[in-house]
Amino acid sequence: MCATNFQAYEWGYTYSAPQAVSPVNRIRRVLDYAVTVMPAGKIMMGFSNYAYDWTLPWKQGTAARVLSNAGALELAASRWAEIKYDTTAEAAWFNYTDAAGQKHVVWFEDARSIRARLKLIGEYGLAGLSIWTADRLWRPIYALLESMYSVEKII
């Protein structure tokens, strides 16, 4: 099968203002267009597997720190941070203050946001997905994948 890989992430990135890495509302807009110019069954959706930690107040040109999703959850737990969920972007986030008193915001993927992205594959009839940074795959991704789809090939 020959397919095109659609990178459905990096709206929020190292040098961007704080925001969801992979907002479902924006992914939908791209997919709505993509399926008008090519068969949905030829589209693989690229999937992010990391988080960003931005220092606040954010200043143009400052870099966010990259974390794994598991690392983001560990950080939230260590700081007793309340994990919140943006229902428009379908993304998890939290605020915390570091040991130096500096405020931060972290956007990451949790089981809810992963499920929301995986549902798009079936909803749009896509060929499947590819996962960026699969070498540090967070276990809930596997569990959700196996509960929702039949995995045919892992490369």
Question: Which ranges hold each PLM region?
Answer:
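Substrate-binding surface in catalytic domains of secreted glycosidases
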Residues: 1-75
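Active-site-proximal helices and loops of the catalytic beta/alpha 8
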Residues: 5, 136-155
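Soluble non-cytosolic domains of exported or imported proteins
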Residues: 18-28, 108-115, 136
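Generic structural signal for well-ordered alpha-helices
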Residues: 27-35, 118, 142-149
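Glycan-binding loop/region signatures in secreted carbohydrate-active enzymes
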Residues: 42-120, 146-155
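Conserved, well-ordered alpha-helix/loop/beta-strand core segments that scaffold catalytic motifs
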Residues: 117-130
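C-terminal functional modules
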Residues: 132-134
